[in-house]
Amino acid sequence: MSKEIILTQEGLEELKAELKNLLEVTRPKVIEELVEARNQGDLSENADYDAARNRQAEVEARIKEVETLINRAKVIDNSKTHSTGEVKIGSTVEFLSSLDHKTKEIKIVGAIEADPFSRLISNESPIAKAILGKKIGDTVEIKDILKPYKITIKSIK
């Protein structure tokens, strides 16, 4: 049984763009490198040929992986976030942290889209689990971490 992959619409579009690039740019380039390396003669001691074959295997594996992700994707429609006023996957949430008393902003995304350095937080993270379904003004405790703390939701976009 294959597990659904939760994605925002933006995440799905990024995967489609990556797949298109792999199929239309990267794969043909690798095939060209493979042909050039093969034309160098003896394949038994041809490092360029071996490298090109390895690169081809990597590209083909990534194509298959991205196709699988796209096929298993469950795209989250967050267009109703504003009407319900609740935090959902795809929501951008501004909150006040009790740790440093600073306002911060994060976007909740599916696990494969997560990038904490870009403030894209996995729906499986402790903070996302704590605020999903909550509303502006709610204060929640972030648990399952070394030092629990509280946050107050200031806005939801």
UniProtKB/Swiss-Prot annotation:
Keywords: Coiled coil, DNA-binding, Transcription, Transcription regulation
One matching Pfam family: GreA_GreB
Coiled coil regions, renumbered to chain: 1-75
Domain of life per record: Bacteria
GO terms under biological process: DNA-templated transcription elongation; regulation of DNA-templated transcription elongation
Gene3D superfamilies from the UniProt entry: Transcription elongation factor, GreA/GreB, C-terminal domain, Transcription elongation factor, GreA/GreB, N-terminal domain
GO molecular function terms attached to this record: DNA binding; RNA polymerase binding
Entries under NCBIfam families matching the protein: greA (TIGR01462), PRK00226.1-4 (NF001263)
PANTHER family: TRANSCRIPTION ELONGATION FACTOR GREA (PTHR30437:SF4)
Job description of the protein: Necessary for efficient RNA polymerase transcription elongation past template-encoded arresting sites. The arresting sites in DNA have the property of trapping a certain fraction of elongating RNA polymerases that pass through, resulting in locked ternary complexes. Cleavage of the nascent transcript by cleavage factors such as GreA or GreB allows the resumption of elongation from the new 3'terminus. GreA releases sequences of 2 to 3 nucleotides.
Entry's family note: Belongs to the GreA/GreB family.
The name this protein goes by in its record: Transcription elongation factor GreA
